[in-house]
Amino acid sequence: MTDDTTKNGPDATAADAAADAAAYVENDIAQEEAPQPDALELLKAENGELRDRYLRLAAEMDNLRRRTEREVKDAKSYSVAGFARDMLAVSDNLRRALDAIPAEVKDAADAGLSTLIEGVEMTERAMLSALERHGVRKLEPVGQKFDPNFHQAMFEVPNPDVPNNTVVQVVQAGFSIGERVLRPAMVGVAKGGPKAAEAETNSVFDEKDA
């Protein structure tokens, strides 16, 4: 009876409390003795993380700026594409009307007819000049290697003097706007000549910009 009282009485409670206190003190001492992170290293790591985030954000903003500038430029360049095609059709009709007049009629034309012909020619030139001011450029394919991206082959012309598939005749002029083809040139290409050299060629746009 006396032994049980000793084990479970106030002395046992005090012993447990002392053990808990000792464990707490040991744990506190261990935490104090553990190496603490260096404040300077923590600051460097934080600065490095912030710098990476800033660089990523700056790159994203630069990409957004470039994309926006490109989209604005394209919108300005290509917004008139449909209108330009319609104007080219009108220009084609003016040219057909002029070409339909026989040379002898032009030579023998009176003042009224001559004035009319000159007026049509001036209108055609003014229209093409206005289109050019808005970025529409005429393609000059004669002598170039046939390129389906810019040319539409209408017929072949036997010609042993020029490389095969060289553009030798233009039936209808082609035009570009910006870096796009507004209308391919309708052309005749040579056949029967030497094989074209397998060399890398510049695009029509590169040649115009050179």
From Swiss-Prot:
Homodimer. One of its GO terms (cellular component) is cytoplasm. This is Protein GrpE. The gene is grpE. The keyword NAD does not apply. GO terms for molecular function: adenyl-nucleotide exchange factor activity; protein homodimerization activity; protein-folding chaperone binding; unfolded protein binding. It comes from the Bacteria. Keywords: Chaperone, Cytoplasm, Stress response. GO terms for biological process: protein folding. It is found in: Cytoplasm. The keyword Chaperone applies. Belongs to the GrpE family. Participates actively in the response to hyperosmotic and heat shock by preventing the aggregation of stress-denatured proteins, in association with DnaK and GrpE. It is the nucleotide exchange factor for DnaK and may function as a thermosensor. Unfolded proteins bind initially to DnaJ; upon interaction with the DnaJ-bound protein, DnaK hydrolyzes its bound ATP, resulting in the formation of a stable complex. GrpE releases ADP from DnaK; ATP binding to DnaK triggers the release of the substrate protein, thus completing the reaction cycle. The lineage of its organism: Bacteria, Pseudomonadati, Pseudomonadota, Alphaproteobacteria, Hyphomicrobiales. CDD domains: GrpE.
